[in-house]
A protein has these predicted regions:
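Membrane-cytosol interface motif
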Residues: 1-16
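Short capping/connector residues at structural and topological boundaries
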Residues: 10-12, 100, 147-150
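Glycine- and small-hydrophobic-enriched helix-loop-helix hairpins
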Residues: 13-120
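Bilayer-spanning, highly hydrophobic alpha-helical transmembrane segments
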Residues: 108-152
Length: 152
């Protein structure tokens, strides 16, 4: 599933942002420099696209560019909320806390999507199981019915 497919793309973007933000928050709290934390997080996400984007963001941060400006260039993959929270973190000096809040928000978004998907799948599975039971019932009873017809 690609990041550009209508439903799954949005889901995976939220998932990657949540994982990225949580990893960066933990690394920054652990004393890792911000640019290095961004780059490390890119290697842990499992997406070549995000790895490349985060490498470019880390390089621009190393050159002295603000993180919020670097992330705003990738608005399709990092929503405005992310850049706004990073801006607040840069202004207050609490970047790690802002990343943790972003991670919490997007983790809840992912949980909501998964919960809604499960709620949609359950009725469909019940119908499929009902059809399969009906087919099994017919497969068992039709030969018996045909046998009775032949005997008469």
């Amino acid at each position: 599933m690609g990041l550009t497919t209508p439903f799954f793309g949005d889901f995976f973007r939220k998932l990657y942002v949540a994982r990225f933000a949580e990893i960066v928050s933990v690394l920054i709290k652990g004393g890792i420099p911000i640019a290095q934390a961004i780059e490390i997080s890119g290697h842990t996400l499992g997406s070549a696209l995000y790895r490349e984007m985060l490498h470019e963001v880390a390089e621009s941060v190393r050159r002295g560019e603000l993180m919020s400006q670097s992330f705003s260039r990738y608005g399709k993959f990092f929503p405005p909320l992310v850049t706004q929270m990073i801006t607040v973190g840069e202004q207050t000096g609490k970047v790690d806390e802002m990343f943790l809040k972003v991670a919490g928000f997007y983790s809840r978004e992912v949980e909501n999507v998964v919960g809604n998907l499960v709620e949609l799948i359950q009725p469909v599975l019940m119908v499929v199981i009902g059809v399969l039971v009906g087919l099994l019932f017919a497969a068992i009873l039709l030969p018996i019915y045909n046998l009775i017809q032949v005997i008469r």
